[in-house]
A protein has these predicted regions:
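Histidine/lysine/aspartate-rich catalytic loop segments that bind and position anionic ligands
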Residues: 85-119, 123-128
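Distinct, well-ordered alpha-helical segments
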Residues: 42-47, 113, 134, 160
Length: 200
């Protein structure tokens, strides 16, 4: 899953439209943030709709143990966190669920990987130099898969990959909560296609 779409505040009932858009555009991984209303039921519904199409459905913004428990119970296929928390990383790794914790400093990147992270999410990367920061981290951390997150959009996505990011994740630049609430999946699809085309 080199590219992950972040669904924050996706409304209940939009799952089929979301999956249809992902299939149409070629997106293979989506995550629902756990601070979204009805996150667990949305994850379960998305997973049911996405499974026939080979789209992975995960949980994001997993900050506490209870979030992880709910995400796993809902059927999340991977876990993403905004920070480096020992408990979440270890429990996910023990459960053999791919875990991508958030980190920012070199110390956090190494710590997250040592604890069992599948990859490490550099967040918020746009606030600390963007692609140049990924390039700087890539030097000493050649063995650690890095995900760029924070401000990733069609204009800069390719730059992150060129700088050494293995994975990209994006939220409001594509999955704008207002567009999802309005059911404007056509505009979302247009933005998503533009981003995916930029990294082909």
């Amino acid at each position: 899953m080199p590219v992950v779409g972040i669904l924050r505040d996706i409304p209940r009932g939009a799952e089929e439209a979301c999956v249809k858009t992902a299939v149409e555009c070629g997106l293979k991984a989506i995550e629902v943030t756990m601070n979204t209303a009805s996150a667990e039921s949305i994850i379960a519904a998305l997973k049911a709709a996405a499974k026939p199409h080979g789209i992975a459905v995960g949980a994001g913004t997993v900050r506490h143990g209870i979030d992880l428990e709910k995400a796993i119970a809902a059927g999340a296929e991977f876990i993403v966190t905004p920070n480096t928390r020992n408990e979440i990383i270890r429990l996910s790794a023990t459960a053999r669920i791919p875990i991508i914790p958030g980190a920012l400093t070199p110390t956090e990147v190494q710590k997250a990987f040592d604890l069992g992270a599948t990859a490490v999410k550099i967040f918020p990367v746009n606030c600390v130099g963007g692609p140049e920061y990924i390039k700087a981290l890539r030097g000493p951390f050649r063995d650690i898969p890095l995900m760029a997150c924070g401000g990733v959009n069609p204009e800069n996505a390719a730059s992150y990959l060129k700088a050494g990011a293995n994975l990209l994740s994006f939220g409001a630049s594509i999955y704008d909560p207002k567009l999802m609430a309005a059911g404007d999946w056509a505009t979302i699809a247009e933005r998503l296609k533009k981003l995916l085309k930029s990294i082909q």
